[in-house]
Amino acid sequence: MENKLTIVVPCKDEENYIGHLLAALRSQEGLGSTKIYIADASTDSTRQVIALNSGHLNIEIIEGGLVSVAKNNGARLATTPYVLFIDADVRFFSSTVIKDTLHLLEERNLDLIGLKIKCYDNSIRSTIAFGLFNITNKVLSRWMPFAVGAYMLTRTDKFNEYGGFPNKYPTSEDFILSKMYSPKKFLIPDHYFGQDSRRFNKMGYFGMAKYLLVNFLNRNNESHWKKIDAKKYW
């Protein structure tokens, strides 16, 4: 896998989460010495947590920044045909998720793969909200791909062709880039990544639903993306 895949993890002040992600990566089958770039801009103890939890993982910490900048910094270093972006707060429910999605990308000659979301902190409301999002995204993906940036596997050449993540926008970089891909070359397989309820706790369930709907309705409105206040989400 190390000759095919590069993993990029954007990170900022994730001392309570990054250790769990690294544990999940250590348990992934076939990962071997796959290069993992953690693009970090933390001011907390994140780097110490990384050092304590790296194990056998082939990790290199590089300069981070805003989400798009951090992801692009890592992708720029990739020399493999595929690059996988994973958020620092992600967990997995299967030890074969990376191996399986990489196989699907190659076998079906796809350009982009995203995953469904599942809540791991036992919040019933978040579980329902994620479930509704999964259904909606699956339906809309027939016309407009959206690989949630928490797990976004792409061909490196296509990523570069589309210009990478848009640095000029403060958030929703995953949505803006995803919709440039062909729906025929996109897949959401039967795998999940896990996240907790923290963004719902910050924005509220109605607030999050409104945020996603407004972004969708303004998907081609340049001025909308430029004026988004990322602090409301992050």
At which residue positions do the language-model features occur?
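Short beta-strand/loop segment that forms part of the nucleotide-sugar
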Residues: 33-42, 62-64
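Short aromatic/hydrophobic "clamp" motif used to bind/position activated sugar donors
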Residues: 83
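A recurrent flexible, glycine/aromatic-enriched loop bordering the glycosyltransferase active site
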Residues: 117-124, 135-154
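Glycine-rich, basic loop-to-helix element that forms the pyrophosphate-binding segment
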Residues: 62-78
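Short, well-formed alpha-helical segments that are part of the catalytic scaffolds
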Residues: 13-27
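A conserved acidic beta->alpha catalytic loop
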Residues: 39-48, 90-91
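Conserved donor NDP-sugar-binding/catalytic core segment of glycosyltransferases
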Residues: 95-125
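Acidic donor-binding loop at a coil-to-helix junction in glycosyltransferase catalytic cores
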Residues: 170-177
